[in-house]
């Protein structure tokens, strides 16, 4: 008995060092983070609209005095404008009673027109104003994450990846519970902003951890494709999961289910990563400012930013546009994103492997062009079925870009800098967050000012124009001191070139400064 227990403990101890288990932890963290990111997409526009108009209807009802009839003997009829009902307490003529009931019914229709046609709102001005409000709420998470990322990158270099990873779980759990019980815009904004800090911890630490345990370029690309599949699954499940539970159970339900799943993730992290131990990197990483001056890293980061900015602009603006032009039901507001989510999942898994063979630069270039063209087609849709093809194209192409550029970030650090990954994946996450910070906030304002179709035209053209810059990532040159290290056969870090040795380098303003020790 003791021997079997000892063998089990030894097996569990060995599993803690398993690369596949670490990959699963990162996959699960990204899955839940992005479920929380997208579960609010169909809920918030409709929820804010409903609480705003409930408030307006209540103000109208409480401000209206009770009707008094001028004819004698009409005091036997009592009218309630709280629930718009008529109660007869005495004798009165049928004609007078019918007239007063008709008047009360007319008042009911006037004060509650929004509830009678909740799926097809007529208050165009209110919907336009909500573009800005919803856009700022969605952008707050990415903005906070954007500001937090550089600090998390430096922190992982000093104390390792497990503690920031577990901290991200704790913050995300608090944010999820806050979403469940928030009843005002202010508390929703705080919950969304708090999620940004947790996401920063999970994303930077998770990707850095994968890059450190998967040192081979091809294996790293495959692993990051799988991890991004978790992100894709979260984006896939979030909107329909949120919209269906919101319509048939209520606002609180999806967030409570999500909170339970987050607790499960925390338990696994606690067992495997042992976040109480500080595990600093064995060598000092390249300064963040040096990485930001590397033009190849900036091109890769720009691809991530502009590709994701397209879907980020869609998140607040598309549900409102659908409510305004298609009279869409609540559940349709989330299901509309389903094609993009499914295709993103397909794209990240297919091109996580294929991009290494065809060239990651080419994969990203084609992805940027497809993103732009698909976004340009979205305003042409007349109903929810017309959104299927362009949304599918958007998701698939963003999957191509993300699964190509994430491994390239680690590859560029191996090739041109010190192989410590916290800071470079902080830059990658900053790029991702810039797309999700600028996208909803600017997108909401642009949609209000010049309309949803012009918003899609602008971001579509930007993506297409940025695409040719990916050509410079075809064969980035190594720094001289790094080339000497990589040529050493005894070097413990293996990196496989993803282009042919005969391909020509394309230097673009390379920084000749040597790395600081």
Curated annotation (Swiss-Prot):
Activity regulation (UniProt): Strongly inhibited by reserpine and tetrabenazine. Also inhibited to a lesser extent by ketanserin and fenfluramine. Reserpine and ketanserin inhibit by blocking the substrate-binding pocket. Tetrabenazine traps SLC18A2/VMAT2 in an occluded conformation and its inhibition is specific to SLC18A2/VMAT2 but not SLC18A1/VMAT1.
Domain of life: Eukaryota
InterPro entries: MFS, MFS_dom, MFS_trans_sf, MFS_Vesicular_Transporter, Multidrug-R
GO biological process terms held by the UniProt record: aminergic neurotransmitter loading into synaptic vesicle; dopamine uptake; response to potassium ion; serotonin uptake; somato-dendritic dopamine secretion
Principal location class: membrane
Family: Belongs to the major facilitator superfamily. Vesicular transporter family.
Protein name: Synaptic vesicular amine transporter
Annotated GO MF terms: monoamine:proton antiporter activity; serotonin:sodium:chloride symporter activity; xenobiotic transmembrane transporter activity
Ranges of the Cytoplasmic topological domain: 1-20, 154-162, 214-222, 275-294, 356-360, 414-417, 466-517
One Pfam family per UniProt: MFS_1
Transmembrane stretches, start-end: 21-41, 133-153, 163-183, 193-213, 223-245, 252-274, 295-314, 332-355, 361-381, 393-413, 418-438, 444-465
Extracellular side: 42-132, 184-192, 246-251, 315-331, 382-392, 439-443
Function according to Swiss-Prot or TrEMBL: Electrogenic antiporter that exchanges one cationic monoamine with two intravesicular protons across the membrane of secretory and synaptic vesicles. Uses the electrochemical proton gradient established by the V-type proton-pump ATPase to accumulate high concentrations of monoamines inside the vesicles prior to their release via exocytosis. Transports a variety of catecholamines such as dopamine, adrenaline and noradrenaline, histamine, and indolamines such as serotonin. Regulates the transvesicular monoaminergic gradient that determines the quantal size.
């Amino acid at each position: 008995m003791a021997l079997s227990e000892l063998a089990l403990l030894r097996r569990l101890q060995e599993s803690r060092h398993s690369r596949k288990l670490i990959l699963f932890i990162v996959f699960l963290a990204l899955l839940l983070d992005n479920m929380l990111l997208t579960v609010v997409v169909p809920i918030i526009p409709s929820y804010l609209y409903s609480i705003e108009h409930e408030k307006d209807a209540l103000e109208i009802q409480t401000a209206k005095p009770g009707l008094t009839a001028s004819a004698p003997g009409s005091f036997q009829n009592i009218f309630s404008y709280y629930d718009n009902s008529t109660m007869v307490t005495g004798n009165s003529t049928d004609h007078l009673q019918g007239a007063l009931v008709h008047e009360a019914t007319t008042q009911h229709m006037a004060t509650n027109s929004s509830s009678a046609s909740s799926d097809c709102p007529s208050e165009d001005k209110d919907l336009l104003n909500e573009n800005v409000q919803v856009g700022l709420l969605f952008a707050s998470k990415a903005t906070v994450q954007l500001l937090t990322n550089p600090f998390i990158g430096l922190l992982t270099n000093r104390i390792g990846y497990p503690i920031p990873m577990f901290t991200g779980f704790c913050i995300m759990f608090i944010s999820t519970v806050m979403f469940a019980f928030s009843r005002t815009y202010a508390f929703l904004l705080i919950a969304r902003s708090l999620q940004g800090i947790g996401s920063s911890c999970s994303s930077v630490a998770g990707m850095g951890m994968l890059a450190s345990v998967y040192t081979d370029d091809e294996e790293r690309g495959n692993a990051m494709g799988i991890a991004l599949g978790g992100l894709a699954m979260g984006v896939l499940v979030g909107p329909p999961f949120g919209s269906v539970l919101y319509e048939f159970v209520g606002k609180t339900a999806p967030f409570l289910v999500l909170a339970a799943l987050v607790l499960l993730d925390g338990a696994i992290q606690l067992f495997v990563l042992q976040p109480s131990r500080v595990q600093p990197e064995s060598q000092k990483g390249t300064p963040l400012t040096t990485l930001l001056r590397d033009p190849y890293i900036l091109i890769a980061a720009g691809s991530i930013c502009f590709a994701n900015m397209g879907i980020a602009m869609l998140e607040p603006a598309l549900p409102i546009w659908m409510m305004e032009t298609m009279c869409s039901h609540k559940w349709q507001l989330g299901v509309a994103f389903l094609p993009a989510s499914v295709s993103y999942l397909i794209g990240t898994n297919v091109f996580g492997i294929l991009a290494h063979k065809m060239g990651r630069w080419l994969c990203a270039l084609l992805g940027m062009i497809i993103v732009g063209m698909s976004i340009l087609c979205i305003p042409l849709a007349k109903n929810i079925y017309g959104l299927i093809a362009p949304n599918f194209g958007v998701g698939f192409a963003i999957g191509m870009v993300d699964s190509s550029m994430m491994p390239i970030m680690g590859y560029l650090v191996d090739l041109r800098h010190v192989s410590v990954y916290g800071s470079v994946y902080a830059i990658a996450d900053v790029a991702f967050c810039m797309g999700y910070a600028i996208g909803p906030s600017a997108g909401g304002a642009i949609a209000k000012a010049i309309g949803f179709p012009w918003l899609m035209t602008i971001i579509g053209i930007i993506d297409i124009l940025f695409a040719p810059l990916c050509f410079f990532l075809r064969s980035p040159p190594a720094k001289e001191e790094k080339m000497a290290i990589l040529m050493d056969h005894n070097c413990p870090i293996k990196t496989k070139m993803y282009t042919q040795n005969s391909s020509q380098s394309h230097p673009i303003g390379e920084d000749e400064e040597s790395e600081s020790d």
